[in-house]
């Protein structure tokens, strides 16, 4: 009820949607644009790196990254992301969201630029330098996950909060599209001026020397969106919930949020003690486990399982495209042509499969709810991956390539109109202000642990384009999604409720506590909602 809440928090919950909410989505969302661009553009350039630095004339085949080098080039940013999520998530609760929010962008800008540099021209020096800077790039990207989600959830009104958080995350879809588009455009420009011969015509001249500039330009352009939003991110005030509930300064919260919402909010201190008392327990306390333990297990497990499947799809699609017939065989084209075709296929799949799913979530999350979207998404992903795995021999024939592409695209669609979006939204809503950023970070970090399994494990099944291994990988991912479907029952629906009502910060019991105190009879008058 509104009367149980602080005036400033009630003002945030009931405020009409206005321009400031939109700018907050853009400012926070550009971090995810950068995140997706930087993490996924490596898929478009990794084959080029192999042809440039690992060509062996004795093999009579185009150069490709050794398994270990390939895993580290792709996976090291995920290791950095996991580390950054934990560090910045904790700092966001201890120091405040705003104080550490700009540092993530600084890391992204510097390390994206440095990713295009290398110390020397030997394979070890180039790959070693690239991995070093991509780790710290991932570290900055990781910090953006808990901070952006928490800031958006604490700024938004309760009727559109899920849509706003999902819109921030949907910028990841835009970033994935641009990763393909930019790679495609730059490689095409170089092709128009420096195209080499097909590999089966001339093994040496098929790898254009100018291609060494292409991958560097693609990676360095990832700094641009982060750089453009740094000033506006620094102009954002601390969230009213953190200022009021954690810092105990209801007056400053009222001033800051009054400016943001362009309304006058009365400062209120008499209810502040109630909220601070409800927030005193720590993350490792028995009280936290009783109140929120199942929810934390639910958000961590579902994000972990989702990212095994989602990152496996994104990071290995470059290996599956030739099997689908969407790109030419490597030994029939030049290095730049291979990058162009891989980028084009990635762009098409993202545009028609990945991108729409994000925005379906934005438009329907407040109507259908987080819980149902996540359940259906996990289930449909499992169905389509199982079909691909079982019918793989049939689908890999060239005459069925568009059926294959449609099924593959639908798995992306239901990942994003499903658990890839909702696993980001739910941890930003389920937990109390004092530990909200940390709990989101823990959930996201488990997700990146799943992504690391895909980068260092699942890729072993697809990199050699072995039919039996790819079938095994798809069936394994289908099973993983069904486990995620089951783990979804550990979380609860959050739509239409204030953050304080969901977490029990307003002095009332949250849903986990209600389950332990509801009477067996279950009559409405006996305490059921």
From Swiss-Prot:
Induction entry: Regulated positively by RAM1 during arbuscular mycorrhiza (AM) formation after inoculation with AM fungi (e.g. Rhizophagus irregularis and Glomus intraradices).
Membrane topology field: Multi-pass membrane protein
Cell compartments where the protein resides: Cell membrane
Function as written in the Swiss-Prot or TrEMBL entry: Low-affinity transporter for external inorganic phosphate (Pi) probably involved in the acquisition of phosphate released by arbuscular mycorrhizal (AM) fungi (e.g. Rhizophagus irregularis and Glomus intraradices) during AM symbiosis. Acts as a Pi-sensing machinery at the root tip level, independently of AM fungi, involved in the regulation of early root branching and lateral roots formation.
Cytoplasmic side: 1-21, 93-99, 147-161, 233-291, 366-374, 427-437, 493-529
Keyword Membrane: yes
Catalytic activity line of the entry: phosphate(in) + H(+)(in) = phosphate(out) + H(+)(out)
Protein name in the entry: Low affinity inorganic phosphate transporter 4
Membrane-spanning ranges: 22-42, 72-92, 100-120, 126-146, 162-182, 212-232, 292-312, 345-365, 375-395, 406-426, 438-458, 472-492
Principal location: membrane
Extracellular membrane side: 43-71, 121-125, 183-211, 313-344, 396-405, 459-471
Entry's Gene Ontology cellular component terms: periarbuscular membrane; plasma membrane
Family in the record: Belongs to the major facilitator superfamily. Phosphate:H(+) symporter (TC 2.A.1.9) family.
Protein species of origin: Petunia hybrida
A molecular function (GO) term: symporter activity
Note: Although related to the sugar transporter family, it does not transport sugars.
Keywords for the protein's UniProt record, in alphabetical order: Cell membrane, Glycoprotein, Membrane, Phosphate transport, Symport, Transmembrane, Transmembrane helix, Transport
Glycosylation sites per record: 314
Polar residues composition bias: residue spans: 510-519
Gene that this sequence comes from: PT4
Signal peptide feature range: none
Positions of region (Disordered): 501-529
GO biological process, one term: response to symbiotic fungus
């Amino acid at each position: 009820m509104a009367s149980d809440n602080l005036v400033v928090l009630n003002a945030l919950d009931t405020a009409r949607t206005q321009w400031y909410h939109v700018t907050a989505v853009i400012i926070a969302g550009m971090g995810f644009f950068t995140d997706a661009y930087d993490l996924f553009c490596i898929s478009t350039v990794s084959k080029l790196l192999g042809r440039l630095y690992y060509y062996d004339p004795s093999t009579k085949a185009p150069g490709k990254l050794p398994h270990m080098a390939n895993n580290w080039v792709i996976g090291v940013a995920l290791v950095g992301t996991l580390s950054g999520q934990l560090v910045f998530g904790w700092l966001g609760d201890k120091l405040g969201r705003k104080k550490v929010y700009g540092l993530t962008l600084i890391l992204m800008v510097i390390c994206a630029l440095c990713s295009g540099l290398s110390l020397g021209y030997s394979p070890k020096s180039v790959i070693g330098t690239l991995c070093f800077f991509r780790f710290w790039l991932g570290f900055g990207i990781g910090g953006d996950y808990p901070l952006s989600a928490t800031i958006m959830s604490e700024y938004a009104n309760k009727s559109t909060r899920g849509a706003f958080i999902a819109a921030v995350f949907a910028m990841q879809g835009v970033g994935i599209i641009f990763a393909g588009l930019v790679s495609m455009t730059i490689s095409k420009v170089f092709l128009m001026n420096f195209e080499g011969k097909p590999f089966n015509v001339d093994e040496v001249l098929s790898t254009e020397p100018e291609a060494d500039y292409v991958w560097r330009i693609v990676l360095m352009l990832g700094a641009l969106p982060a750089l453009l939003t740094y000033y506006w991110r620094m102009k954002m005030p601390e969230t009213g919930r953190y200022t009021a509930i954690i810092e105990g300064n209801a007056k400053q919260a009222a001033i800051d949020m009054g400016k943001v919402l362009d309304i006058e909010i009365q400062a209120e201190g008499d209810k502040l003690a109630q909220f601070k008392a409800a927030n005193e327990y720590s993350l490792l306390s028995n009280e936290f486990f009783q109140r929120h333990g199942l929810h934390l297990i639910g958000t961590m497990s579902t994000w972990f399982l989702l990212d095994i499947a989602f990152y496996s799809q994104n990071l290995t699609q470059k290996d599956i495209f030739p099997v689908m017939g969407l790109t030419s065989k490597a030994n029939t084209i030049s290095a730049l042509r291979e990058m162009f075709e891989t980028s084009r296929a990635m762009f098409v799949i993202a545009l028609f499969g990945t991108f729409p799913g994000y925005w379906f979530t934005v438009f329907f999350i407040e109507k259908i709810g987080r819980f149902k979207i996540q359940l259906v998404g996990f289930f449909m992903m499992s169905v389509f991956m199982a079909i691909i795995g079982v019918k793989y021999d049939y689908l890999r024939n060239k005459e069925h390539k568009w059926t294959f592409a449609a099924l593959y695209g639908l798995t992306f669609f239901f990942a994003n109109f499903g658990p890839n979006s909702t696993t980001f939204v739910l941890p930003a809503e389920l937990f109390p202000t004092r530990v909200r950023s940390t709990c989101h970070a823990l959930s996201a970090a488990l997700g990146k642990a799943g992504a690391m399994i895909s980068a260092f494990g699942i890729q072993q099944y697809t990199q050699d384009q072995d039919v039996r291994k790819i079938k095994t990988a798809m069936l394994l991912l289908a099973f993983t999604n069904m486990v995620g479907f089951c783990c979804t029952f550990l979380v609860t629906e959050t739509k239409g409720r204030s953050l304080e009502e969901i977490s029990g910060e307003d002095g009332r019991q949250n849903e986990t506590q209600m389950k332990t105190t509801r009477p067996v009879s279950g009559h409405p008058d006996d305490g059921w909602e």
